[in-house]
């Protein structure tokens, strides 16, 4: 009895005297593709809805959806994030083998980077559009805009989806919405969840930016402007109570803010409108320089 009392007292002392746990350091950079440190800053799972969690980093979205039959992950961030994502699965009380599906938005290293490692370690199946499947299989090489500058480990897609196709897992239906532009194979996803028991429609819309892209007379992507226009309209029409995007700041999210992360989150319409304004300004500048 005396030993138990001493043990409890010692435990209480250690708890009170322990220093505040500091934030973990950022994940290491890749020599070939360096990014902002916040893109690599780990974070613990952040609740978005009752069964949907952000488990990526402060500036890269990776959404974990917990279903009645395993887990679904929408995007994964950078290649070096695989172990971090698996650690966050464990924080949620799951094992790697519980991951069933990897849903892709687009085939860039900062979103599909860890898919190969995750597929290998969990057995999860990769789902993407046909255009993205080609890019995923070659690890981002010969990209329309970036060439071989942002490579990632190649991964074979297990299921190719069409626009409007539904992917069902454990009672949750994920609908694919084609939104080409940022890449020809870009996809957004919508599904239903609850928040505090009330129904909520979630939309994960793909990036609508055109970073350094040639928009006029692009020989490798001649329909790029038309595709962006169509995608702006697609995003506006999504069933959308809560919007999330691969880069959270573009849709008003601040994952570092914890419980207040979505305080300034945009609607789907506001996101599409803001993206189209930026696109129009970029297009006008390109036209001006071409004169």
Can you name each region flagged by the protein language model?
Residues 51, 65, 75, 85, ...:
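Divalent metal-coordination and catalytic microenvironments
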Residues 267-291:
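C-terminal regulatory/interaction regions
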Residues 24-34, 41-43, 47-49, 71, 78-80, 98, 156, 166-168, ...:
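Metallo-beta-lactamase
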Residues 38-92, 96, 188-210:
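Conserved beta-strand hairpin/beta-sheet module of binuclear metal-dependent hydrolase folds
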Residues 1-9:
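Bacterial N-terminal signal peptides that target proteins for export
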Residues 80-83, 90-166, 263, 271:
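Active-site HxH/HxHxD metal-binding segment of metal-dependent hydrolases
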Residues 8-18:
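Bacterial N-terminal signal peptides
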């Amino acid at each position: 009895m005396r030993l138990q009392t001493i043990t409890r007292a010692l435990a209480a002392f250690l708890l009170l005297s322990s220093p505040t746990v500091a934030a973990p350091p950022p994940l290491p950079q890749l020599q070939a593709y360096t990014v902002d440190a916040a893109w690599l800053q780990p974070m613990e799972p952040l609740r978005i809805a009752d069964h949907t969690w952000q488990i990526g980093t402060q500036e890269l979205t990776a959404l974990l959806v917990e279903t009645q039959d395993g887990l679904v992950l929408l995007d994964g961030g950078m290649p070096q994030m695989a172990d971090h994502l698996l650690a966050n699965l464990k924080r949620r009380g799951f094992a790697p083998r519980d991951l069933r599906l990897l849903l892709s938005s687009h085939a860039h290293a900062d979103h599909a980077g860890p898919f190969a490692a995750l597929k290998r370690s969990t057995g999860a199946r990769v789902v993407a559009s046909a255009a993205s499947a080609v890019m995923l299989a070659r690890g981002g090489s010969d990209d329309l805009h970036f060439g071989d500058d942002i490579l990632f480990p190649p991964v074979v897609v297990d299921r190719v989806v069409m626009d409007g196709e539904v992917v069902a897992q454990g009672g949750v239906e994920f609908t694919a919405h084609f939104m080409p532009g940022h890449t020809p194979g870009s996809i957004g996803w919508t599904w239903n969840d609850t928040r505090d028991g009330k129904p909520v429609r979630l939309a994960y819309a793909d990036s609508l930016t055109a970073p350094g892209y040639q928009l006029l007379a692009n020989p490798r992507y001649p329909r790029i402007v038309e595709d962006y226009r169509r995608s702006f309209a697609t995003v506006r029409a999504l069933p959308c109570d809560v919007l999330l995007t691969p880069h959270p700041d573009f849709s008003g999210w601040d994952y570092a803010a914890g419980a207040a992360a979505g305080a300034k989150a945009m609607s789907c319409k506001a996101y599409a409108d803001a993206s189209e304004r930026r696109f129009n300004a970029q297009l006008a500048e390109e036209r001006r320089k071409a004169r």
